[in-house]
């Protein structure tokens, strides 16, 4: 039988654009693959998987380059990159959007906006929609319209066959329903190569947005007020809040309300009464302008970084709030922060076992962030993140799989909760030989949970 050849745009170590081609969002975890294939279509992806299997070459799958632990890269081996497959097709009457695997959020938002539609997705413009969806997908429409994966109706996926080949299958709630379930929060890269997704989009036009800032002295009052307000207010309002180190002297709450400014102002009264706000803004704007407002330029830039996170099921105690404050008083640099987003609403009306995204009962998703410039700073930054995570563990649970943390020992249960065994059964059905694997990929049942 004739051997498969790689097709698509192929970059190797000798190419002048190799360094750009291999670079992911996290510069503290350098990886040097031998070959990067930028797939132009589904056939390129099929050929890449077949070639890797025939030649016994390890590989990784990459989309938006936003894997915090660089799980989409490897040393030596092959990277199968989908980022140049970006076609978006919209059926306005049925409100369906067919989106290829390489499309980024900014492009998706802009295209759907032309039809008066959108998806409940994230805020950073160059995050890949596919990876976001496979991990669940939170953003500033979460409480109004659910997680990104809740809007998924179908996907195309390349899976490994029993020999050395690859098959393209269509996955939905009626076709391979177990794999469809796993694709709604089970994380990327575990079961196959997603080449496209189809979503049920939601109508959107004007939204109202807000920003409120405070100084450090209001830390406890603002934290406590926000956590007891944001997850329980009107479902049409989704908000986030970020706390920076003491010397930065800044706390900022942001949010988006699918409704008029007059209603939003009423809803914000409890938050505005907290402490002494240093600035405030409330306005109504076209949704696409809100997308630009919430896009974080810093989140788009490759940098040396460490991330982790957790979920909160009930408001944190004064002791836990003091712990967060203490860590921010002793942060490794001024770029460190603790960021939270309110959950509940539409996302919380889905049962924990209805999709692979387990943490439906959480009221808050909490992310721990830091980045630095000198390689010598890595250790203290990682220790700060892990110390914060461990210190809060008695009052938090799990971690969002899209905020992976290589330091977490029991990562399968941390990411997937009670859904982990079902995910392993799905893995065993579709990838019993563990062809699709990386440092924290779901293992099939016949393999150790920690491998």
UniProtKB/Swiss-Prot annotation:
The modification Pros-8alpha-FAD histidine is found at residue 66. Its EC number is 1.-.-.-. Keywords: FAD, Flavoprotein, Oxidoreductase. Its cofactor is FAD. The keyword Flavoprotein applies. Disulfide bonds: none annotated. InterPro entries: BBE, FAD-bd_PCMH, FAD-bd_PCMH-like_sf, FAD-bd_PCMH_sub1, FAD-bd_PCMH_sub2, FAD-linked_Oxidoreductase, Oxid_FAD_bind_N. It is an enzyme of class 1 (oxidoreductase). Residues 29-204 form the FAD-binding PCMH-type domain. Transmembrane segments: none annotated. GO terms for molecular function: FAD binding; oxidoreductase activity. Belongs to the oxygen-dependent FAD-linked oxidoreductase family. This is Uncharacterized FAD-linked oxidoreductase YgaK. It comes from Bacillus subtilis (strain 168).
